[in-house]
């Protein structure tokens, strides 16, 4: 099991909070969003963490290197982050996506530790977790073996 984190975006709507850093480096209660997420993932002993970077990518990678994460981290660069979206960033990581079961995260999320455990413990082959307070289209795709 691996994790892919999409962290290439500019976070324009956060204005001055992201002028010189990525959205996932914004701090909430004194902890950067990416710091919290990486430590939550680290406790699950996954095989690797793939992070797609773009805007302020060098700064983000340097910051992550200071966190002491022991799980191997692989970086994928989205050079046209300012013209694309998360689907494009995910496509850039497709080679990794095909190699292992994957937990996919957007880098600016805050969630309880139990959320990852619920995903890992669920017996279904394909699963999506969404915010219950927002309308969305959610479906479970059948297994290719069915």
Model-derived segments and spans:
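Short catalytic helix/loop segments, enriched in acidic residues and glycine
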Residues: 23-33
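Short amphipathic alpha-helical segments
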Residues: 17-19, 38-39, 62-65, 115-118
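N-terminal nucleotide-binding beta1-loop-alpha1 segment
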Residues: 1-18
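Active-site acidic Asp-centered loop
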Residues: 105-106
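Conserved N-terminal catalytic core of the sugar/cofactor nucleotidyltransferase
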Residues: 2-5, 31-102
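Conserved core of the sugar-phosphate nucleotidyltransferase
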Residues: 112-146
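A generic "binding-loop/recognition-motif" signal
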Residues: 10, 21, 56
């Amino acid at each position: 099991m691996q994790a892919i984190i999409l962290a290439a975006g500019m976070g324009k709507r956060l204005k001055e909070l992201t002028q010189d850093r990525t959205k996932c480096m914004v701090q909430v209660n004194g902890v950067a969003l990416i710091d919290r997420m990486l430590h939550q993932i680290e406790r699950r002993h996954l095989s690797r963490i793939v992070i797609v970077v773009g805007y302020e990518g060098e700064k983000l990678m340097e910051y992550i290197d200071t966190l002491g994460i022991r799980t191997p981290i692989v970086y994928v660069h989205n050079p046209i982050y300012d013209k694309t979206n998360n689907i494009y960033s995910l496509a850039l990581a497709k080679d990794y996506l095909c190699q292992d079961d994957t937990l996919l995260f957007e880098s600016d999320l805050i969630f309880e530790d139990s959320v990852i455990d619920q995903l890992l413990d669920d017996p279904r082959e394909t699963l999506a977790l969404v915010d219950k307070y927002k309308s969305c289209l959610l479906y479970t795709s059948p297994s290719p073996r069915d």
